Amino acid sequence: MSRYVFTSESVTEGHPDKICDQVSDAVLDACLSEDPTSRVACEAVVNTGLCLITGEITSKAEVDFNKLVREVIKNIGYRSASDGGFDANSCAVLVALDQQSSDIAQGVNEAEDHSTDPLDQVGAGDQGIMFGFACDETPELMPLPISLAHRLARRLALVRHQQLIDYLLPDGKTQVSVSYENGVPCSIDTILISTQHKSEVDGITLEEEIQKRIAKDLWKFVVEPATEDLPLKPAKGSTRFLVNPTGKFVIGGPQGDAGLTGRKIIVDTYGGYARHGGGAFSGKDPTKVDRSAAYAARFVAKALVAANLAKKVEVQLSYAIGVAKPISILVDSFGTGKVSDSELTQLVQDQFDLRPGAIIKAFDLQNLPSIRGGRFYRDTAAYGHFGRTDILLPWEDVSQKAKELSLLK
């Protein structure tokens, strides 16, 4: 019998790196809402009292970047110096944006395929490799460790916003270790929550007593509600529960650590359970295959698992800048496939159009911000881009495609 423990982590929206992801995607939403053809590559940096946005944007949209950045930071919860040491109203906002390079633009605007098909004329915005993954460990076909870590992080933010625990501050991290037997989750080994908090908790000032109170409240208001509908639940007697292992977490957010866009790519995807091509998502418009092709790869993998063609699937795609069709497609079912991996790969090549233009069209990636009232990508920037049950994501809806694949068996 094979036994092992696998661990994944998540972070809350108030984590410095996640602030940056949300700022970058808020800029993307604003540009695409007014001009769906906008080319955006927006990076953000936060530090004590500072938010810088930089990168390349070519767009007809008129955006008040200063106002937008402050609104994002304020909505996260950094409304004053007492809300974690970072203040949306008084922090400096610096904007240093250029236009997209004409050399890159020509490859995206007119692919090298010399085809009359409009979808062949949208080239990949860069070279690169992307991975998509799905497995049958959860209803949303995600690995259990990252699914649980996101549940806890979302719940941690919710109880803060709703003041169910009134001493919590925006920065926080979760980590979940799951025990497996023969590749199947069998128990939750460890839950770790690090959460920023006020220096005084309901009149308690002794550090040891504060941490005991926080641990008690987090189990009651975060862990139990976040896992109540799961068949595999943490057990108070056997699941190790760690809270703020350093002893306290008062200094946090950008005051405690600098943040950068794109530094939580494993949190954004599969929690380390599957491979990653290295490209971040946030702040990138859909012509960047780092983002759009990773979404498509997830769609392919999830459809294959939903169609019961395999219990676990990883899909690799690769692209060349300025070329529409993928350079390569590879499917790995880890020995769980109903047919061989080569047959699954051929099936993907035959049944999925993975040109950037086709992906953008199928998921309506350029129009989603305006369709959703000016905000879409920003909502993907915290708590993962895959397996979401709280927001509607087109690459997660595989029901129709899974039916079509089932008929091909």
UniProtKB/Swiss-Prot annotation:
Protein name per Swiss-Prot or TrEMBL: S-adenosylmethionine synthase
GO CC list: cytoplasm
Quaternary structure annotation from Swiss-Prot or TrEMBL: Homotetramer; dimer of dimers.
Entry binding sites for Mg(2+): D17
Keyword terms, alphabetized: ATP-binding, Cytoplasm, Magnesium, Metal-binding, Nucleotide-binding, One-carbon metabolism, Potassium, Transferase
GO MF annotations in UniProt: ATP binding; magnesium ion binding; methionine adenosyltransferase activity
Name of the encoding gene: metK
PANTHER family per the UniProt record, alphabetical: S-ADENOSYLMETHIONINE SYNTHETASE
rRNA-binding is among the record's keywords: no
Cited PROSITE patterns: ADOMET_SYNTHASE_1 (PS00376), ADOMET_SYNTHASE_2 (PS00377)
